[in-house]
Amino acid sequence: MSRYRGPRVRIIRRLGALPGLTSKTPQLKSSSINQSTSNKKISQYRIRLEEKQKLRFHYGITERQLLNYVRIARKAKGSTGEVLLQLLEMRLDNVIFRLGMAPTIPGARQLVNHRHILVNDYVVDIPSYRCKPQDFITIKNQQKSETIISKNIEFYQKYKIPNHLTYSSLEKKGLINQILDRESIGLKINELLVVEYYSRQA
């Protein structure tokens, strides 16, 4: 399944707020519609499916990519669900988003694809690049790169940066301090339901 490029508002109306996909918040429809929906019997499969879709759309990844992350998480030590979230959060495009250098993860991915971003002083143009503690993220020393990202930072750094990251406005430099903990995830998600969804596939 390819990466979603359709209307984002339609997705958040169905799944709830997905800050990585869009900064817009879902507007609830009339109470009569909500009540009729709540009265329907929702299957366990659908509940798991929707949690899985939240991860896919929030992080902007394909079905195949998510399944691959689940397989990696299963082989790692610790809680599969928590490891899965850590893998997704340490993607370069997500780190740029969480630092406030881009308004959304698709926006961060575009910065990476257009070679505006350096990791440890080297240009990295792979959005899925897995960052690690003590990696530092900087902007390519070009006026276009600095202008684009400076505008984003001025606006989006009013939101709190998670504890595992720091950003120096003076140096225009982001630092990954450590692997994040569960409380720092920027998404309302039940990762165990996602693991259960893939239990027969991973």
From Swiss-Prot:
The entry's cellular-component GO terms read: chloroplast; small ribosomal subunit
Q: InterPro entries, per this entry?
A: Ribosomal_uS4 (IPR022801), Ribosomal_uS4_bac-type (IPR005709), Ribosomal_uS4_CS (IPR018079), Ribosomal_uS4_N (IPR001912), S4_RNA-bd (IPR002942), S4_RNA-bd_sf (IPR036986)
Ranges for domain S4 RNA-binding come to: 90-153
Cite a single GO MF annotation: structural constituent of ribosome
**One GO-annotated biological process of the protein:** ribosomal small subunit biogenesis
Which UniProt key words apply to this protein?
Chloroplast, Plastid, Ribonucleoprotein, Ribosomal protein, RNA-binding, rRNA-binding
Chief subcellular site? plastid
Signal sequence range: none
PANTHER family according to UniProt: 30S 40S RIBOSOMAL PROTEIN, SMALL RIBOSOMAL SUBUNIT PROTEIN US4M
Free-text function comment from the UniProt entry: One of the primary rRNA binding proteins, it binds directly to 16S rRNA where it nucleates assembly of the body of the 30S subunit.
Q: Which family does it belong to?
A: Belongs to the universal ribosomal protein uS4 family.
Name of the protein in its database record:
Small ribosomal subunit protein uS4c
What is the organism of origin for this protein?
Arbusculohypopterygium arbuscula (Moss)
